[in-house]
Amino acid sequence: MKRIRMMGAAVALALPLIGGPAFLAVPANAVTCLPGTATPTDSYPGTVVMANNFESGTLAGFAVQTGGTGTATVSTAQHRDGACSAYLHVTSDSGSIANFSTALPSGTKQVYADGWFKITVAGLSGNDVPYFRFFSGSTRFVDVYRYNSNGQLWLRVLTPGGTFAYTRLTASSVSLNAWHRIAMHVTPKGSATTVQVWFDGTQVYSSSQVNTVATSVTRVQNGSEHPQQMGDEYIDDLIIKNLTS
């Protein structure tokens, strides 16, 4: 364990996110997607909350937050299958933010998050490009990301004392300009929280004794909630599932 400091044509449907600046984006041109593409599925347990290949051409169903030069759109520039994917673009400019979130039903005890990610532009050294971030209310308590300084995959946990605990998940760099699958299982129970992480189909982390500040989970976020988290990231075949026991 280690501590470190941390468009092709596009269309977006932006929904207000409580607690942050949000702007409604009105598309000038609709992208050409393939709405007949099969809805993504996986073998993880739970009830499907979100299963999206972004072939609708919109981010409908997500809470979208953008600010400054940040954009959250659907793009035809990159796609794992079909013709479209979600695209988050954030710069180093002041106030640049882009993310979208999946709200979880009341009573959620466990959540599985699964998706494909392609980072084409990394951010500034010392910062990161997020994959999945898990929130309890407004508090982010678990996330995984690609660390810009060396490209490694890291897990970050907010402890009850208010400090972050970091775990390196891969020794090698996560390659840019390539699709990678990230899946996570999170069951928030304070000092007995379960966190599991899979990278490209291989489990790289599993513990039922993770010490977190959270005892509930209310949403899963893609992208960063704070500004200047520079990076270009495409997301496809996103699946979020919940369990109530």
Predicted regions and their residues:
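Short, aromatic/His-centered strand-loop micro-motif at the edge of beta-sheets
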Residues: T159-R181
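Glycan-recognition/cleft segments
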Residues: V129-V157
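Short tryptophan-centered beta-strand motifs in secreted/extracellular beta-sheet-rich domains
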Residues: N177-P188, V197
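Extracellular glycan-recognition surfaces and repeat-rich motifs
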Residues: E55-S94
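Flexible glycan-contacting loops in extracellular carbohydrate-active proteins
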Residues: S207-D237
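Secreted extracellular polysaccharide-interacting domains
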Residues: S85-Y112, T163-L169
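Secretory targeting and sorting signals
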Residues: M1-A30
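Extracellular carbohydrate-recognition regions
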Residues: V31-T66
